[in-house]
Each structure stands twice: as C-alpha cells, then as structure tokens.
Amino acid sequence: LTQIHEYKGEQALFIEAKADTLTKLVEIAKIQSTEASNKIEGIYTSNERLKKLVQDKTTPHTRNEQEIAGYRDVLATIHESFDYIPPKASMILQLHRDLYKFSGASYGGHYKTLDNVITEEDEQGNKTIRFQPLPAWETPEAVDSLCRAYEEAVGKGDMDPLLLIPMFILDF
C-alpha cells in the first residue's frame, strides 16, 4: 500500500507527460471492461458494434446493445465524477437506473421485488445453486447498512481506503 501511495505522486507527472498515451489506454480499457462485464451477464454483440457503442458513435439496435450503452454511460459517469459519487444507496440506485435507461426496463433504479438465486447448469442440464442473494425485503436495509459501515470506517481513518473499497465491493 505504501508503494501505491508513493506512486500516486508520480502519477500526476506521468499523466501530464504522456496524456495522449493514457487517453488511448483508457479507451482500450473501457472497451475491454465493457466487453468482459457484459459477457459475464451473457450480453454480446460484434466487436465492431461494441467498439462503436463504447465510443458513442452509434445507437443501440438490440436489447443487448441497449444494456451495453447503459453500461458505457455509467462507466463514463464513474470515470468523470468518481470524486463526487458518495457510496450511498440513493447513488447506487441512480447508477442502476442509468444502467437500464436505454432498455426501458421498469426495474432500473429500484431494488429487486422478487427473491432470486444464481444457478449454474452442467453439461447434463443439472442445475445447482451457485449463490443465494438476500431476500428482496432485506435488500434496501442491507445496502443502507453497508454504505453506512463503509463511510464510518473511512471516517475513522484506521484502515486504508484501498483495503476498504474491495471489502465494500465484495460485500455488495
């Protein structure tokens, strides 16, 4: 962690000296992040369409592309405004709303209303429960509690935020 914090000072110099290179790397990272994150959810499009969607050079034609466009916009919001995005339930719901804004999905920006399980299916078609999320009725309080706990831990200053952030993500 100490090395990471030391390099943060050098990062500003590197950004200034190599701005064009970093801009290109950020664009590549956005495309790769969008592709990987959407593939996990079973959302696909062609590489050419993906690149154009991420660069906002075309409009989405399919439901998959609508979800990719929403992801692109949320990722852009996070990249451009991360210093101003508090870890609060209302902000998480706002980002969730924006994620689904192209698809017209009514659940965007709302907590789930039905219980669900994450299953996996083997080659023979047998399903097993991979993960069982909280029941729908517990979700709002759990998100509020997680956000409060994170902010309290950061406020105390006892732990480095670089350790708290992945803990928050894992618990989320």
Which residues does each predicted region cover?
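FIC/Doc superfamily catalytic core
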Residues: 1-172
